[in-house]
C-alpha cells in the first residue's frame, strides 16, 4: 500500500505558517498542513474568568469550521443553537494544550482567547489548530512585552501537535482525510520542545 500523496509513512505533510495574516488581533497566523488550512487569532482582554486565582491569567480557545471547509456543506453551530460535541471537545483540547505553554502568574490578570477557524479541512485540523494557536499566542505575548505591559514573555514552552494512526494495519504519521476516515486507530499527540508529551488523545 502506498499513500495517496506519495509520502513515506513517517513523513509529515508540507507545513507553512504565515504570521500576522490578519491585522486586528494581537497575534494571528494562517497555518497550512498540506491541504488543511486554519486561521488562528489571539485576542487579549484585561480580565479573567471568576475561577482564576488572583494575580494569574488565563488562556482559552474556540474552534469552528467554515460551512464549506469540507467536501459537503455543514451547518454552523450558531444555526443549531449549540456547540457541537466535536467542536467542544476540540476546543477544550486546544485550550489545555496552550495553557501548558504559559506561566499564568507572569501573564498577569489577562485572558488570551485563541480562535481557530478551519478554512479547509483535510485531516489533522485539531493538531494544526494547536500548532497555529501556539504561534498566535506567542505573537500576542511578544506584543505585550514590546508595548511595555510585561517585562518578559510568559511563554515557558513551545507547543505543537501531530496526528498518527493505523490504516489497513500500517502505522502512519500525519493522516490526511482519506486516511483518517478509514483509520483503525487515530491518535493526536501534543508535545513541547523538550519532547515532553502534554496530551495524547486517541480513538480506535
Question: Language-model segments: which ranges?
Answer:
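A structural signal for small-residue-enriched, beta-sheet-centric alpha/beta enzyme cores
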Residues: 85, 106-109, 124-128, 138-142, ...
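Glycine-rich, charged/polar anion/phosphate-binding loops
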Residues: 15-18, 24-28, 45-47, 99-101, ...
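A short glycine/serine-rich beta->alpha loop
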Residues: 79-83, 116-125
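Structured core elements
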Residues: 16-18, 30-32, 39-41, 60-62, ...
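Flexible, glycine/charged-enriched surface loops at secondary-structure junctions
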Residues: 2-7, 12-14, 104-111, 146-153
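Short, Gly/Pro- and small/polar-rich lid/capping loops
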Residues: 1-32
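Buried hydrophobic packing segments
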Residues: 94, 98, 132-141
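Glycine-rich, flexible beta-strand/loop modules in the N-terminal catalytic cores of phosphate-handling
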Residues: 21, 29-107, 197-204
Amino acid at each position: 500500500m502506498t499513500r495517496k500523496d506519495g509520502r513515506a509513512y513517517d513523513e509529515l505533510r508540507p507545513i507553512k505558517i504565515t504570521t500576522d495574516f490578519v491585522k486586528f488581533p494581537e497575534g494571528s497566523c494562517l497555518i497550512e498542513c498540506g491541504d488543511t488550512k486554519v486561521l488562528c487569532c489571539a485576542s487579549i482582554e484585561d480580565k479573567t474568568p471568576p475561577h482564576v486565582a488572583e494575580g494569574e491569567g488565563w488562556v482559552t480557545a474556540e474552534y469552528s469550521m467554515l460551512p464549506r471547509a469540507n467536501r459537503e456543506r455543514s451547518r454552523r453551530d450558531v444555526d443549531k443553537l449549540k456547540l457541537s460535541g466535536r467542536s467542544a471537545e476540540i476546543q477544550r483540547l486546544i485550550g489545555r494544550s496552550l495553557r501548558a505553554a504559559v506561566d499564568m502568574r507572569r501573564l498577569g490578570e489577562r485572558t488570551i482567547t485563541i480562535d481557530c477557524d478551519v478554512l479547509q479541512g483535510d485531516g489533522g485540523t485539531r493538531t494544526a489548530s494547536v500548532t497555529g494557536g501556539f504561534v498566535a499566542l506567542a505573537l500576542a505575548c511578544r506584543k505585550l512585552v514590546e508595548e511595555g505591559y510585561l517585562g518578559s514573555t510568559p511563554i515557558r514552552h513551545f507547543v505543537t501537535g501531530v496526528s498518527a494512526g493505523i490504516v489497513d494495519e500500517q502505522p502512519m504519521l500525519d493522516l490526511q482525510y482519506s486516511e483518517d476516515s478509514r483509520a483503525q486507530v487515530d491518535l493526536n499527540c501534543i508535545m513541547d520542545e523538550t519532547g515532553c508529551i502534554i496530551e495524547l488523545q486517541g480513538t480506535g
